[in-house]
Curated annotation (Swiss-Prot):
SMART domains: BTB. The keyword Membrane applies. Keywords: Cell membrane, Cytoplasm, Membrane. CDD domains: BTB_POZ_KCTD7. It comes from the Eukaryota. May be involved in the control of excitability of cortical neurons. It is found in: Cell membrane; Cytoplasm, Cytosol. One of its GO terms (cellular component) is plasma membrane. It comes from Bos taurus (Bovine). Residues 1-40 are annotated as: Disordered. Pfam families: BTB_2 (PF02214). This is BTB/POZ domain-containing protein KCTD7. One of its GO terms (biological process) is protein homooligomerization. Its main location: membrane.
Length: 289
């Protein structure tokens, strides 16, 4: 009787190892791609672009020369349109970039002829230049207002200890007080002082000449915390208290807050002898709606 089985004869060697032909067949046999993988496969050949390139930037349509997009080699646009990367097209055959195109025209104008945007669009175009990594445009925008002035302002704020932390504290305190009181606005006290050294009372100018020599141990007698919510200072720079107040209002307003402030007096903390604190205290009013 002949017994027929459904298995092919085992070609493996007695020691359990596969023959060289079996190993080669297993190694060379490619995996069969699924329909999903085949549908998302990208072209293997370099993508070719026409001399005049139609663009769709987030729904905004532009047309420019290929040489314009490749003007600066170390930019994202030059890399995208180098042929090394695949760029999808829309239904009309325009090359699509998934980015808001509101200010892409200013980017193109710089690439075409070196034109710069007006002041009111400098900040927005700067963000686009960062995204597309256009170094020459970034350099020129940084030398324009308001970015040039912002660099000077940040240099001053860099001397201010914990400026950002204290700014966030102002917002958080104002929010909590408004929520707790179910109020439209909240008020808080802020102390802003440039110098650590306390001064004598205003009504006794003669006492200004009576300052005594202080030792290091005496310094503790002058250290105290004014009864306020947040304090800023001291700092070493030409910029004064009013400059810092301007920075506070600017940065709070940039968060969409309505800010009012006024000086409501000074800290009258008595320290030692004829020395009082006299740091100015400001009331900040944060309106939420």
């Amino acid at each position: 009787m002949v017994v027929v089985t459904g298995r092919e004869p085992d070609s493996r060697r007695p020691d359990g190892a596969m023959s060289s032909s079996d190993a080669e067949d297993d190694f060379l046999e490619p995996a069969t791609p699924t329909a999903t993988q085949a549908g998302h496969s990208l072209p293997l050949l370099p993508q070719e672009f026409p001399e005049v390139v139609p663009l769709n930037i987030g729904g905004a349509h532009f047309t420019t020369r290929l040489s314009t997009l490749r003007r600066y080699e170390d930019t994202m646009l030059a890399a995208m349109f180098s042929g090394r990367h695949y760029i999808p097209t829309d239904a009309e055959g325009r090359y699509f970039i998934d980015r808001d195109g509101a200010h892409f025209g200013d980017v193109l104008n710089f690439l075409r002829s070196g034109d710069l945007p007006p002041r009111e669009r400098v900040r927005a175009v700067y963000k686009e230049a960062q995204y597309y990594a256009i170094g020459p445009l970034l350099e020129q925008l940084e030398n324009m207002q308001p970015l040039k002035g912002e660099k000077v302002r940040q240099a001053f704020l860099g001397l201010m200890p914990y400026y950002k932390d204290h700014l966030e504290r102002i917002v958080e305190i104002a929010r909590l007080r408004a929520v707790q009181r179910k109020a439209r606005f909240a008020k808080l006290k802020v102390c802003v002082f440039k110098e650590e050294m306390p001064i004598t009372p205003y009504e006794c100018p003669l006492l200004n000449s009576l300052r005594f020599e202080r030792s290091e141990s005496d310094g503790q007698l002058f250290e105290h915390h004014c009864e306020v919510d947040v304090s800023f200072g001291p700092w070493e720079a030409v910029a004064d208290v009013y400059d810092l107040l301007h920075c506070l209002v600017t940065d709070l307003s940039a968060q969409g807050l309505t800010v009012d402030h006024q000086c409501i007096g000074v800290c009258d903390k008595h320290l030692i002898n004829h020395y009082y604190c006299k740091r100015p205290i400001y009331e900040f009013k944060i309106t939420w709606w």
